[in-house]
C-alpha cells in the first residue's frame, strides 16, 4: 500500500512547489528574508559510493568504516566538555544531495545529515580546501550572495559565533579533528528546477579532515533553526533509501509532498533533548528476536532529561544500528541461540557477529526481529538486519555503543518510507520499494 502510494506520488510530480504568503510564527521570524514560503518539493539522493566500481564487500566495508567514524563523532558530542569554544557536530554520512548554489547556478553535491543543522559548502578564497568534483563556489561571482550580519538571529543561532567587520563567522568541529571554518552568508539554492532565495549557509574557507570524494559540503537536516527544514519552515519531510549497491537514487520529500504520504502505523514519539536539540530522539520500549521478548528494561533506551544521556536517535548517516551494550549483548546472544549455526569471526569486514551459512540455503532460518515502539511494533525484513558480505557468510548489521546512546542506523531503514513530522512530534515507518517507478 505504502509502496504503491509512494510510487504514485513520485510519478505524479517529480518536483512540486507552491508559494503562499508567509505567516507570523516563531520559526518564520527567523526566515524574515524569505519573500515566499516553499511548501513542497523533491530532492534526489545518491549513495556516496554510487557509480564506483566496487564489489559488495568493498561497499559494505567502506560504509561500515564511515559509520564507525560517525559513531565516534556522535559519542564525542555526548562527551564534549561544556563551555568549549568549538562545538562538535555529527557530519559525514551516506547519502549525497545534488543541488546548485548562486546566480548563475553552480552545481555541487553535499551530504544529507539528520545529525547536524548547518548548511555549508567550500568557498573561495580557500585557506585550506579538499578536492571536489565541481568548481569551488566563488561568492564574488554570484549576484544573489549576501554576507550575514552579526546581528542576524541566524548568526546568533550558531553555538559559538564570532564577528569580523560585522560579518558573521562560524566554526564547526566534527569530533575526530575534522573542522570547517568560514563566513556565514545568504544565497539562492536550487533543487532541480526549484530555486529558493535567501538560504543562510556557511561559506567554508578552511576545511580540514574531509575530502574522501563525499561531496563539497553538508546539508543539515536536524531540528535546529539553521537546518534546511527549519529555514524552509516545513515540519514534515520523508525519505525512502534504496539499499547499498543499488544504482537507483533515493528520494527525499519536503513539506507538502511529505504531507501527502501516509506512512501509518507503526510510529514513534519524537523527543527533543535540551542538551543536543539537533538529534531526532525516538521512543523505543523493547526488542524481540523470534518469539522471544528480550529482558531489556525500557530505561535502557530512555533519554535522561536531566543530563542528556541515554536515549535512541534515528540517523540517516550511521550505517549500522547500535544499541547500548547490555541491550546489544542480549540481542547477540538470542540470535546465536536461535540460529544455531557456527559463529565465525567477521571483524575483517567490520561486523561483530557472523555465521557460516549452510551449503543448502533453504536450511537457513533467520528469526524475526521486532522493535517495539510506543506507537506500534516495527518488524524489520531480514535483509535489513542480516547481510551477506561474501558467500557462505551472513552477519548481523548491528553493534554496541559505548556511551549510553543507541542509534537506529540506515541499513535498517532501507526500502522503508520514513516520515519525520516535527509538528506532531512523531516518526512513522512503512515498507516500500524505494526508487520504484
Swiss-Prot record:
Segment forming the signal sequence: 1-24
Chemical reaction(s) catalysed: Similar to pepsin, but also cleaves on either side of Asp and at Lys-|-Arg
Coiled coil: none
Annotated S-S bridges: 123-126, 129-203, 150-168, 155-163, 240-434, 354-395
Keyword terms of this UniProt record: Aspartyl protease, Disulfide bond, Glycoprotein, Hydrolase, Protease, Secreted, Signal, Zymogen
Regulation: Inhibited by pepstatin and by diazoacetyl-D,L-norleucine methyl ester (DAN) in the presence of Cu(2+) ions.
GO terms under biological process: proteolysis
Ranges annotated as spanning the membrane: none
Active site: 113, 315
GO molecular function, one term: aspartic-type endopeptidase activity
Entry's pH dependence statement: Optimum pH is 2.6. Retains 95% and 79% of the original activity after incubation for 30 days at pH 3.0 and pH 10.0 respectively.
Subcellular location: Secreted
Glycosylation: residue positions: 53, 98, 131, 198, 267, 307, 345
E.C. no: 3.4.23.12
Pfam families per UniProt: TAXi_C, TAXi_N
Peptidase A1 domain mapped to chain residues: 95-430
GO cellular component: extracellular region
Protein task: Extracellular proteinase found in the pitcher fluid of carnivorous plants. Digest prey for nitrogen uptake.
Family in the record: Belongs to the peptidase A1 family.
Protein's name in the database: Aspartic proteinase nepenthesin-1
Gene this chain is encoded by: nep1
Amino acid at each position: 500500500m505504502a509502496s504503491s502510494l509512494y510510487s504514485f506520488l513520485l510519478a505524479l510530480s517529480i518536483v512540486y512547489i507552491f508559494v503562499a504568503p508567509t505567516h507570523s510564527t516563531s520559526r518564520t521570524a527567523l526566515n524574515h528574508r524569505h519573500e515566499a514560503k516553499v511548501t513542497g518539493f523533491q530532492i534526489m539522493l545518491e549513495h556516496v559510493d554510487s557509480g564506483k566500481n566496487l564489489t559488495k564487500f568493498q561497499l559494505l566495508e567502506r560504509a561500515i568504516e564511515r559509520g564507525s567514524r560517525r559513531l565516534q563523532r556522535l559519542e564525542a558530542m555526548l562527551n564534549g566538555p561544556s563551555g568549549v569554544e568549538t562545538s562538535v557536530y555529527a557530519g559525514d554520512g551516506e547519502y549525497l544531495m545534488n543541488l546548485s548554489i548562486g546566480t548563475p547556478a553552480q552545481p555541487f553535491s553535499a551530504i544529507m545529515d539528520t545529525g547536524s543543522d548547518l548548511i555549508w559548502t567550500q568557498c573561495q578564497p580557500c585557506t585550506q580546501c579538499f578536492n571536489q568534483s565541481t568548481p569551488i563556489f566563488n561568492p564574488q561571482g554570484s549576484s544573489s550572495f549576501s554576507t550575514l550580519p552579526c546581528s542576524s538571529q541566524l548568526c546568533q543561532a550558531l553555538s559559538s559565533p564570532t564577528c569580523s567587520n560585522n560579518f558573521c563567522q562560524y566554526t564547526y568541529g566534527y569530533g575526530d579533528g575534522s573542522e570547517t571554518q568560514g563566513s556565514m552568508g545568504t544565497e539562492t539554492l536550487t533543487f532541480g528546477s526549484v530555486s529558493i532565495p535567501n538560504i543562510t549557509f556557511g561559506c567554508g574557507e578552511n576545511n580540514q579532515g574531509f575530502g574522501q570524494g563525499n561531496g563539497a559540503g553538508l546539508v543539515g537536516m536536524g531540528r535546529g533553526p539553521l537546518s534546511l527544514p527549519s529555514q524552509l519552515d516545513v515540519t514534515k519531510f520523508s525519505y525512502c533509501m534504496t539499499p547499498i549497491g543499488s544504482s537507483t537514487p533515493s528520494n527525499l520529500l519536503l513539506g507538502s509532498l511529505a504531507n501527502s504520504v501516509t506512512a501509518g502505523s507503526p510510529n514513534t514519539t519524537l523527543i527533543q533533548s535540551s542538551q543536543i536539540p539537533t538529534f531526532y530522539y525516538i521512543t523505543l520500549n523493547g526488542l524481540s528476536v523470534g518469539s522471544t521478548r528480550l529482558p531489556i528494561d525500557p530505561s535502557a533506551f530512555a533519554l535522561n532529561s536531566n543530563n542528556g544521556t541515554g536515549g535512541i536517535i534515528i540517523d540517516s548517516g550511521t550505517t549500522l544500528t547500535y544499541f547500548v551494550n547490555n541491550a546489544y549483548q542480549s540481542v547477540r546472544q538470542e540470535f546465536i541461540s536461535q540460529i544455531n549455526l557456527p559463529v565465525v569471526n567477521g571483524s575483517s569486514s567490520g561486523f561483530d557477529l557472523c555465521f557460516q551459512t549452510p551449503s543448502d540455503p533453504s536450511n537457513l532460518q533467520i528469526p524475526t526481529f521486532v522493535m517495539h515502539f510506543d506507537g506500534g511494533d516495527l518488524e524489520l525484513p531480514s535483509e535489513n538486519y542480516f547481510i551477506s558480505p561474501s558467500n557462505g557468510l551472513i552477519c548481523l548489521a548491528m553493534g554496541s555503543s559505548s556511551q549510553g546512546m543507541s542509534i537506529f542506523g540506515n541499513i535498517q531503514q532501507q526500502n522503508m518510507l520514513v516520515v519525520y513530522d516535527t509538528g506532531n512530534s512523531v516518526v512513522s515507518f512503512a515498507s516500500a520499494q524505494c526508487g520504484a517507478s
